[in-house]
Structure formats: structure tokens, C-alpha cells
Amino acid sequence: MIKESTRAAVDALIARYSALEACRADLIKAVEVICASYRQGHKLLVCGNGGSAADAEHIVGELMKGFLLKRKIDDVMYAKMKKVCPAEADYLRDNLQGALPAISLVDEIGLNTAFANDQAPDLSFAQQVLGIGNAGDVLLGISTSGNSTNVIYAVQMAKVRDVKSIVLTGRSGGKLKPLADVAICVPDDETYRIQEYHLPVYHMLCIAVENEFFGPTEE
């Protein structure tokens, strides 16, 4: 279950991009899967290639700090800060923000290049899922074609590790669609137009999840 105000983020997205009505059920399911994972103390892993790699970085940036909300440090955390570092506690409280744990798998340049050189370039994301993916985590794989080999292997390894998978693709969904727990297949076939849908979709995911954990409580 998610808050009605969280679900409203999906409605707001579709109000602006009516073609995404076809994706409504999958958009809601993606929000629910990510929220369920965070509620249990797990994390989000994100991967993609080229422009989708940049999207992976963008998503992590929105989740690990405040996006639309202030995400104030709560009283329990502040009390721990005062105990550990009393002189700096106020500074930390006033400037740090609540975080939603997220890791971009495209970031690990040393690991990715070493693994590509020594083993198999198309398995670099899968290697990271093997290494840091834990049961209850979520993998978000982005591929406009739905056929990116390294993302496919990452999703397969996610299943091995009991990590839920969400994929963000174009209309066909490619080979990723049947592999993923949730497939958001935006309604276009041209790469740049698919990417133009992907950005508002993942912004919505970040807005919705942020609201679920840092937005106003509901009766």
C-alpha cells in the first residue's frame, strides 16, 4: 500500500503526458515495489548505457538528497548526532538531508574496466549485482531498446539474488520485458523520443517515493 498523495504523482505525470496512460498499472507497480523495498531498509541499484547511464546517475542524485522536499533530519537521528559529535550536531542537522539509498552501477570505473579487461565486459553490471545485491533490494535497468546485453545479464543476476527488477524501455520492451518483475514500456520506438519519456517517468518515481517517506502523513 502507498499513500494516496504518492499515487497522485502517477496521475500528475499522465495528466502531462497522456500517452503514458497505457503504462499506468506498471508505473504504480514500480512505485509500490520501490517503496516496499525502502520500507524494509533495502536499496535501489540503477544501470544503463550511454544516455541511460546518465539517467542512472540522475536518478541516484534525486534519491540520495532532497528533490522536491526538505527531508529534515528526524529527532532520533539528531539525538545520535548530539551524542557522537555534540559540537557539530546542529550543523549536521541543518545541512544534511534524509536519503533514500541508491547506487549507480555505472559509477565504478575501476571495477568496470578491470572486469571488462580481465573477464567479460557485458557482465560488469551483473558482477556488481552479485556483489552488492541483497534479497529485498530493487534493480532499475534502463534500456531504450530493451535489448542491452549487460542490462539483461544484470536482471538475470537480480533474479538469482532475489532482487526485484524494474526495467524502463521503449514500446516493445525487447528481451528485458519478460525477464523483469515490472516493465515500463513507454509508447515510442525512436531512441531519442523514448529518452524524452524516460526522464519524466523517473522524475515521477523519485517524486512519488520521496513523498511516501518524507511527505505529510495521511490518516
Q: Whereabouts are the PLM-identified features?
A:
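Generic N-terminal amphipathic, Lys/Arg-enriched alpha-helix
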Residues: 1-21
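Glycine-centered short loops/turns at secondary-structure junctions
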Residues: 41-42, 136, 162
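Short, glycine/polar-rich helix-capping loops at beta-to-alpha or helix-loop-helix junctions
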Residues: 167-180
